[in-house]
Amino acid sequence: MKGNNTIFKQTLLLILFCIGSNTVSAQQTFTNPILDYGADPYSTYHNGYYYYTHTMQNHLVLLKTKNLADLKNAEKKIIWTAPKNTDYSAEIWAPEFHFINDKWYVYFAADNGSNNTHRMYVLENNSKNPMEGEWIFKGKIAAQTDKWAIDGNVFIYKKQLYMIWAGWEGDTNGQQNIYIAKMKNPTEIDGDRVRISSPTNPWELHGALHDDVNPPQVNVNEGPQFLSHKNKVFIVFSASGCWTDYYSLGLLTFTGKDNLLDPLAWVKSDKPILEQSHKTKVYAPGHNSFFKSPNGKEDWILYHANSNPGEGCGVKRSPRMQQIRWDKKGNPVIGDPISEGFPLAIPSM
């Protein structure tokens, strides 16, 4: 019996060791995609937690986790549902949560059911915990011209609050540009907008449409995201139509001194910094955001992409993440989109 007990104990210890090893392994690595679906992924880090969201069409959802690679097990809450029959009841796109001056804000684009009416809106929450408190609708946020607008991103540069977004120059669809403006406060734009990017390069001009609702061709710059590294300032944006496999990320580099509203100070990359890869079987990567690892030492990118060619702008888009490197000149290097199922180390704790 003693021999049998010894064998039993050794076997049990081996099983427990294997289980423990697998648990540790699962905690230390992850694979893309990090969720089965989710377009326009955005995350912000605050007080030891990541707060994540993505486009949900008619409501806003917030996920809370210490590890973005474990989003499937994150705490989840619907924090706001659009009321019916308003200018902002439908097509809620690209929400972003920001903690500014001890308050939480969520910026999003929405319309009344017709894409031509898309504008940006903002909610405010006085609670230090965005999963609690009351989210109050503060209204539309627009420049003086008040044209079609989506994909708002806010940031602070040298103590000044700015907003960047995608919009139309006039009142008809056909081309989306990137605009920037100063903000008076987190709910108001100060003055008018300045255009800093338009689709001009061949890789930005994949936008043919084949339906009766839209123009035959729409050229796209959208989804701008602020990025800084040491003393350099960038805006990463999405180019070409999301309905094409050529949806990709481009880079604007600020070459001026202090005036971010100088359009001549923004220089565009000659080619995408992230694009589809037949080699890794990832298609239409775009509409990204950035985050740092919990220890603050690593820079990471979140983006959505499709697993197969021709899947377009639908529910097949899923969020992925991978680490950013920096070249000797201080420019971001992303590389190819990582293959699905390829194990990656989680962001350093």
Question: Where in the sequence are the language-model features?
Answer:
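Bacterial Sec-dependent N-terminal signal peptides
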Residues: M1-Q28
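Carbohydrate-active catalytic/glycan-binding domains of CAZyme proteins
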Residues: A26-M349
